Amino acid sequence: MRDDVNQSFYDVLEFVRIFRRKNKLQREIVDNEKKIRDNQKRVLLLGDLSDYIKSETSIEGIQVIIANMRNDYEDRVDEYIIKNAELSKERRELSKKLKNFKESTID
């Protein structure tokens, strides 16, 4: 009987741990989506800026800087997309564990 109580207690602790991790992942995903949107807006801004700048010698240097900044922002967007996919995958796995955990404790 005591082992059953201990096991149930540890099962509840594990359930809480998984549930908290799942919620944390969801918050990180939302945060990354915001970062993706922000950086996509920066990419558009820099694209518009490049369209308006005239191609004089001194401005060419500015265009090179803008192009480099744009590439940096695009790289960040890609990194956040990859990170978001990884977080989503882990969240799905935790959801499955929680579902299986609930089903096994009900039986």
Curated annotation (Swiss-Prot):
Coiled coil (UniProt feature): 70-104
List the keywords (alphabetical). Answer: Coiled coil, Cytoplasm
Q: Where in the cell is it found?
A: Cytoplasm
Q: Does the keyword RNA-binding apply?
A: no
Recorded hits in InterPro entries, A to Z, give: DUF496 (IPR007458), UPF0265 (IPR053375)
One GO cellular component this record assigns the protein to is: cytosol
- From the record, give the cysteines joined by S-S bonds: none
Q: Which family, according to UniProt?
A: Belongs to the pole-localizer TmaR family.
Q: What does this protein do?
A: Pole-localizer protein involved in the regulation of several cellular processes.
Q: Which NCBIfam families match?
A: PRK05423.1, PTS_reg_TmaR
Official protein name in the record: Pole-localizer protein TmaR
The species this protein belongs to is Blochmanniella pennsylvanica (strain BPEN)
